[in-house]
């Protein structure tokens, strides 16, 4: 029987927001700050919300306008307190205003007559990557790269089984040692979970640690094994709090009277076949997790390769785009897709395009065709979808860009403005340099185009993505230059530790 293993899961607390606070010489735990690109309008997503601002029931991935609205609600209540204590000031408009505001939680808690304010920090993705790398190197002072798995930019799993006797420490002591060093070096605190498998370590961090008091530095560390998991979490709700259990899965479980992990475990005793009918092979994962089991260890997750065989580019436009400008964006996105395929030495069998229309098309009246509801419950025109299959798998820009433009023309209503565009390269496979030819195929021309793409890619990788651009990328409404300066769809910012103004 294999020896029981011990895993850590470590999550950096409100990572992006914490980096912005530290770089401003502010306390990440008491400073009200959101990371969001306000230049994109208030519909933009907040990439992070500081802990003190989350305390006002602002979720970590809210839209900026949702944070703005919640702060207005809080300030309406605080202003009443200021008026009652005669600390508000009456303006020339005859309305009461705060005499002062603060973005510091300690000041706000000690003086209920202060107005709640907050900092909106533009995202600096390169800076976050640099700090994440620095923190990863801290972990490597204690464990081997073979025993650590970066789950995301701010979260890692570590197999500490062999290190506990080496350091003569408990798992809790080793976790605290690493978290303390990260805090000392970067000013960023963390939450950690300890488990007898990866799943339990993750739940200890995500769920259990949230319900225990933090120390003076905001650090929380919780532990779970299979028995304590069943005792503490079998009745926990909602099910969406559990790792890898999304809303769709929960909806199907609840349709069968399953509302907790305890319900699922008991159902699996006699209803295992039914679970496989509902969820297919995923039922095995659900059943294992219901009982607190996870067969995969560090070696398995490190060797896992996603089975996806598509590459996609998506973009939400900053304003509604008319037909011609949207077509320009499609050509730009197809070019980006072409370079990604070229860099990965892949070819695609087809391209799928989805065009999402703006709600102004309905709001202005006159639109009487098919509609759908967006995530906010608003009525918008039904999105357009289409696919074009190539004569042979390809990554050539002349084919991908031109066929994408033709597909756009075929599926898009020219009378409507566009807000969202997604393009997918489907059934991608390794590029073996083989062309499907006929009497009319100029193979030398194809080879020349491929070599040109590779040369352009080399220049972009060495000197920057904006060193080689088409003239169309300088037209009004083009977004290629801006997107090339982004990481993950957000501003790369600076990496010098200096926050943007």
Model features per residue range: what roles?
Residues 189-191, 352, 420-422:
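Residues at or immediately flanking beta-strands
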Residues 2, 9, 241, 247-417:
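DNA-contacting surface of Y-family translesion DNA polymerases
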Residues 405-461:
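C-terminal hydrophobic structural anchor segments
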Residues 1-288, 295-298, 443-501:
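Gly/Gly-Pro- and Ser/Thr-rich, intrinsically disordered tail segments characteristic of DNA damage-repair
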Residues 363-367, 433-437, 481:
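Short conserved micro-motifs at the rims of enzyme active sites and ligand-binding pockets
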Residues 153-156, 347-362, 424-432:
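Core structural elements
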Residues 156-162, 384-391, 435-441:
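Short, hydrophobic beta-strand segments
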Residues 29-31, 349, 384-386, 419-421, ...:
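A generic structural signal for short beta-strands and their flanking turns/coil linkers
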């Amino acid at each position: 029987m294999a020896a029981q293993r011990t895993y850590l899961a470590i999550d950096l607390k409100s990572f992006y927001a914490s980096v912005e606070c530290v770089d401003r010489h502010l306390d990440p735990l008491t400073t009200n700050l959101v990371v969001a690109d306000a230049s994109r309008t208030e519909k933009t997503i907040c990439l992070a919300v500081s802990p003190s601002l989350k305390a006002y029931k602002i979720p970590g991935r809210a839209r900026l306008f949702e944070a703005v609205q919640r702060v207005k609600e809080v300030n309406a209540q605080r202003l009443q307190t200021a008026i009652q204590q005669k600390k508000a000031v009456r303006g020339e408009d005859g309305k009461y205003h705060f005499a002062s505001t603060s973005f510091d939680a300690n000041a706000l808690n000690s003086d209920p007559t202060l107005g709640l304010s907050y900092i909106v920090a533009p995202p600096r993705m390169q800076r976050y990557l640099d700090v994440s790398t620095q923190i990863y190197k801290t972990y490597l002072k204690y464990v081997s790269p073979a025993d650590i798995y970066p789950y995301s930019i701010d979260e890692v799993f570590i197999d500490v089984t062999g290190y506990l006797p080496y350091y003569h420490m408990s798992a809790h002591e080793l976790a605290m040692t690493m978290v303390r060093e990260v805090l000392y070096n970067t000013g960023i605190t963390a939450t950690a979970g300890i488990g007898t498998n990866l799943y339990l370590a993750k739940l200890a961090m995500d769920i259990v640690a949230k319900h225990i008091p933090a120390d003076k530095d905001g650090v929380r560390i919780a532990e779970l094994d299979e028995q304590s998991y069943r005792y503490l979490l079998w009745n926990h709700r909602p099910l969406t709090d559990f790792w890898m259990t999304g809303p769709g899965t929960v909806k199907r479980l609840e349709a069968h009277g399953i509302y907790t992990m305890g319900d699922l475990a008991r159902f699996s005793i006699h209803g295992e076949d039914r679970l496989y009918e509902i969820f297919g092979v995923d039922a095995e994962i659900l059943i294992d997790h219901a009982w607190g089991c996870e067969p995969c260890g560090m070696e398995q997750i490190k060797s896992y390769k996603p089975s996806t065989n598509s590459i996609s580019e998506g973009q939400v436009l900053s304003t509604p785009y008319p037909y011609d400008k949207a077509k320009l964006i499609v050509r730009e996105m197809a070019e980006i897709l072409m370079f990604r395929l070229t860099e990965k030495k892949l070819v695609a069998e087809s391209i799928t395009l989805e065009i999402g229309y703006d709600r102004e098309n309905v709001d202005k009246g006159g639109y009487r065709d098919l509609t759908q509801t967006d995530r906010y419950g608003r009525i918008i025109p039904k999105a357009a979808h289409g696919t074009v299959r190539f004569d042979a798998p390809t990554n050539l820009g002349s084919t991908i860009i031109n066929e994408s433009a033709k597909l756009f023309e075929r599926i898009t209503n020219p009378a409507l403005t566009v807000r969202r565009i997604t393009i997918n390269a489907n059934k991608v496979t390794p590029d073996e340099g083989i062309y499907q030819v006929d009497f009319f195929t100029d193979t030398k021309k194809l080879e020349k185009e491929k070599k040109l793409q590779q040369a352009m890619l080399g220049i972009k990788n060495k000197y920057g993505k904006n060193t080689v651009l088409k003239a169309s990328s300088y037209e009004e409404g083009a977004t290629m230059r801006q997107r090339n300066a982004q990481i993950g769809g957000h501003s790369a910012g600076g990496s010098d530790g200096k926050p943007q103004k």
